[in-house]
Design a protein with these regions (language model features):
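Hydrophobic transmembrane alpha-helices and their immediate loop junctions
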Residues: 1-373
């Protein structure tokens, strides 16, 4: 990212109204103020942020090794500085990983055939396009809304992986100060809504592959359908289940399933997940009370499936346990704290409720199970 050349020095007069200034230093392009805050941290940021932002600076509060209060002003970032090689490298790696996983797992191309003619792997391009299309649309929704609100956000980082989808998803980094609850809400909600729009396009795509029955026997993984997928499939008359349990749906549908599942996980109302940002914008500090319930609920769900329903750890039990642990850790960090805490209007609040409702339609108790054919 390229730094904006500030039009002037940081507005020291504004800072001194809430900060007893001892010393000012310039370090690595930043202006660092040492002293003693006269008000609580959040109040200081709220008081000085508008003037600093107008002058072209982000402002942060910290403390020194000598227990002095420190205010750091750094030039605001905007645009892209040079070629984003890390983003490009991860994207290309994920294209390759989803292509390989798609070819061997969902198109049933033998390894020997791929070795003999590597171009046969290109048959899995529809799967790769579906998966990456959903993920990138989701993250670009965050990115574009962040740029709209003038918040420093990174380009998406797509994470390659192995079976069963070839990716762990995608993330962006929010590096700038969050100006208000409206910006926090808009950035948080843009990703899930954009991703679900892409998921709808994927599941209704005319580029389908006829279902085929698997010839081999033994154990196979079954991806059960969330309600939203069944609703979309009903509209286009495309079956997602078959009388023969060995029949495999179109890999395009698998891309839609993945988009819905990632949306569900992202809408968990904890920490830096989209749901955490959205609920923080909607409820303010009350979001923390809801966040405490999430890990407990996920562990309870895993226990219910294992001890009452008899599902194994390698089915959805392990999945919910993992997300219970992950949500426990990320809940401690919490979502971004906006400078301006003015509540949202009714329109945004209703959009938030609608977004969580769509997320609920992506939920099912047992997303993954193992069956013996």
């Amino acid at each position: 990212m390229g730094a904006v050349d500030p039009a002037s020095d940081p507005p020291v007069e504004t800072l001194q109204s809430v900060f007893h200034l001892y010393e000012t230093r310039r370090e690595d392009g930043r202006v660092v103020f040492y002293g003693e805050s006269l008000v609580p941290e959040q109040m200081l940021i709220r008081e000085v942020w508008p003037a600093f932002r107008q002058a072209g600076y982000e402002v942060e509060f910290s403390s020194s090794a000598a227990n002095e209060d420190v205010v750091i002003a750094r030039p605001m970032e905007t645009g892209i500085d040079g070629i984003p090689w890390k983003n490009i490298g991860l994207f290309v790696s994920t294209v390759i990983s989803t292509l390989l996983v798609g070819a061997f797992t969902w198109y049933y191309i033998p390894v020997s055939a791929a070795i003999e003619n590597p171009l046969v792997l290109l048959r899995a391009l529809p799967f790769t396009a579906a998966v990456l299309g959903v993920l990138m649309t989701h993250e670009l929704g965050h990115y574009l809304m962040g740029r709209y609100h003038g918040v420093d956000v990174s380009l998406p980082y797509v994470l390659p992986f192995i079976f069963p989808f070839g990716t762990l998803g995608a993330i962006i980094q929010i590096r700038g100060q969050m100006p208000d609850r409206k910006a926090l809400f808009d950035i948080g909600v843009a990703g899930p809504l954009a991703g679900l729009a892409a998921t709808t396009c994927v599941t209704q795509s005319p580029i389908t592959i006829p279902a085929r029955a698997l010839e081999q026997s033994g154990q196979m993984i079954i991806f059960n359908n969330p309600p939203l997928l069944d609703i979309l499939a009903m509209f286009i008359g495309e079956p997602t289940t078959y009388a023969d349990p060995r029949a495999s749906v179109s890999p395009i549908i698998i891309g839609g399933w993945l988009g819905m599942f990632f949306t569900l996980l992202n809408l968990l109302p904890v920490g830096q997940l989209d749901g955490g940002h959205i609920l923080r914008a909607m409820l303010g500090g009350m979001q923390e009370r809801v966040a405490v319930i999430v890990p407990v609920s996920l562990f309870a769900l895993a226990g219910y499936l294992h001890y009452i329903q008899g599902y194994a750890l390698n089915e959805s039990v392990g999945l919910w346990m993992f997300w219970g642990l992950l949500s426990t850790f990320i809940a401690f960090k919490g979502p971004a704290n906006p400078v301006d805490e003015q509540p949202l209007g009714l329109g945004r609040f209703l959009i938030g409720l609608a977004t969580f409702t769509l997320g609920a339609l992506c939920f099912l108790l047992v997303p993954i199970e193992v069956a013996t054919m």
